[in-house]
Amino acid sequence: MHKKLTKEVDYMDAVLYVCHGSRVKEGADQAVAFIERCKKNLDVPIQEVCFLELASPTIEQGFEACIEQGATRIAIVPLLLLTAAHAKHDIPEEIQKVYERYPQVEVLYGEPFGVDERIVDILVERINETNVDKHEDSMVLLVGRGSSDPAVKRDLNEIAQLLKGKGAFKEVSTCYLAAASPNLKEGLHLAKRTSYKQVFVLPYLLFTGILMNEIKEELEQLSTDAQQFILANYLGYHDGLAHILSHQVKTLLSSKGNQYDVYRYA
């Protein structure tokens, strides 16, 4: 997809942020608000937001909006936590469809956030923000979106181990909202069977949406006098996340794209 350049070229740069999308309008609105705040950290003339599914503008519409403003190089940045099918296949396929109509445009493709200790620090903050005094006998149930890609389970387990150390918890277990096991009900059931007096349920999600509502519904009436279930907030906007995203964009635009081929997952 990338042209081999023999001399320096002056580009009109653009950034196209690809969010997942949500049936819940608030979730899509939060994604846009997050990007609007992140834009201020970057000196890039053209910055657009689009969605993979369930919301608009689409990837095609976002790409074309960049072209209409004169972009000659577009850094496409997936606003996703972990690398799974969306980042490896779905987004690249959509990019390829529209790129074929604009082969003169240089396209760079970025990475999801991945395993990052700075994000784990934010998770600790979200637990602390519950304003519940942490019992020495407590655990965390880290709830991921889920994927059939084994790399997602590997990465979430790594994040769980980092969280266990940083948050000084005796145990951090994982479960998933879809496409992987244990699922949410199973994860909660396993936590219920433990002797821990507190279970912090921590959604590993960027924004609210149907999945966040599902977690809330499952948590209703689980707490007892002997065991307390506490729902922490999703990641949402955080200056630390904005800094990570800005750094990713700057790195991408300085790379000339030769290691950011959308086919690298094939």
Swiss-Prot record:
SUPFAM superfamilies, per the entry: Chelatase
Protein name as it appears in the record: Sirohydrochlorin ferrochelatase
UniProt: Fe cation binding residues: H20, H86
Disulphide bonds in the chain: none
GO biological process: siroheme biosynthetic process
Pathway: Porphyrin-containing compound metabolism; siroheme biosynthesis; siroheme from sirohydrochlorin: step 1/1
Keyword annotations of the record: Iron, Lyase, Metal-binding, Porphyrin biosynthesis
Similarity field: Belongs to the CbiX family. SirB subfamily.
Alphabetized CDD domains for the sequence: CbiX_SirB_C, CbiX_SirB_N
UniProt keyword Lipoprotein, yes or no: no
Broadest EC class assigned to this enzyme: lyase
